[in-house]
Swiss-Prot record:
GO terms for molecular function: GTP binding; GTP cyclohydrolase I activity; zinc ion binding. The gene is folE. One of its GO terms (biological process) is tetrahydrofolate biosynthetic process. This is GTP cyclohydrolase 1. Toroid-shaped homodecamer, composed of two pentamers of five dimers. InterPro entries: GTP-CH-I_C/QueF, GTP-CH-I_N, GTP_CycHdrlase_I, GTP_CycHdrlase_I_CS, GTP_CycHdrlase_I_dom. Its EC number is 3.5.4.16. PANTHER family: GTP CYCLOHYDROLASE 1 (PTHR11109:SF7), GTP CYCLOHYDROLASE I (PTHR11109). Belongs to the GTP cyclohydrolase I family. Pathway: Cofactor biosynthesis; 7,8-dihydroneopterin triphosphate biosynthesis; 7,8-dihydroneopterin triphosphate from GTP: step 1/1. It catalyses: GTP + H2O = 7,8-dihydroneopterin 3'-triphosphate + formate + H(+). It is an enzyme of class 3 (hydrolase). Zn(2+) binds at C75, H78, C146. It comes from Campylobacter jejuni subsp. doylei (strain ATCC BAA-1458 / RM4099 / 269.97).
Length: 190
């Protein structure tokens, strides 16, 4: 499979008018293969395994928010990067998730070919289902190189998506608290 991938990269270089045998490009097919292997490693990771090993009994029934989770992903339409920050909150239902697992969850889905809307939904759904949470809220703010480098070429534009589940969808007060915590956090840095 690796050889087939590298041959495709070599062909692409030839099609755009490059010499894949010149010094600077000779190892490019292998480098691109390794990069894509890493950037799409989310396909080989199991969400249940990541979260189920880190669910802990707790009487906490208040919101848990992990904000400013930096991520990068590849747009499934152009294979160009998009990157930004995810804010993930949930309300526990007798169990809390190990805090490091929430960024890992974001990473699992970000390391796949994606669109931001789907990424947001997948994170929310996976946390809701696997943590048996009372509710989940996910907001992602990202910059897309397919928008900035090609097409409309609008540098520094940001796309924001949200996904709400359970009590976050049904209870306006909880939703407001979630949005307030995210917005107030932008003012304060440690």
């Amino acid at each position: 499979m690796q050889k087939k991938f590298e041959d495709c990269v070599k062909t692409m270089l030839e099609i755009i008018g490059e010499n894949p045998n010149r010094e600077g490009l000779i190892k490019t097919p292998n480098r691109v293969f390794k990069a894509y292997e890493f950037l799409t490693s989310g396909y080989t990771q199991n969400v249940k395994e990541i979260l189920n090993d880190a669910l802990f009994e707790s009487s906490n029934n208040e919101m848990v928010l992990v904000r400013d989770i930096e991520f990068y992903s590849l747009c499934e339409h152009h294979l160009l990067p998009f990157f930004g920050r995810a804010h993930v909150a949930y309300i526990p239902n007798k169990k809390v998730v190990g805090l490091s697992k929430i960024p890992r969850l974001v990473e699992v889905f970000a390391r796949r070919l994606q669109i931001q809307e789907q990424l947001t939904e997948q994170i929310a759904q996976a946390l809701m289902e696997n943590a048996d949470a009372k509710g989940v809220g996910v907001i992602i703010e990202a910059r897309h190189m397919c928008v900035e480098m090609r097409g409309v070429q609008k540098a520094n534009s940001t796309t924001t998506t949200s996904a709400l589940r359970g009590i976050f969808l049904k209870n306006e007060k909880i939703r407001e608290e979630f949005f307030s915590l995210i917005n107030s956090a932008k003012q304060v840095r440690f």
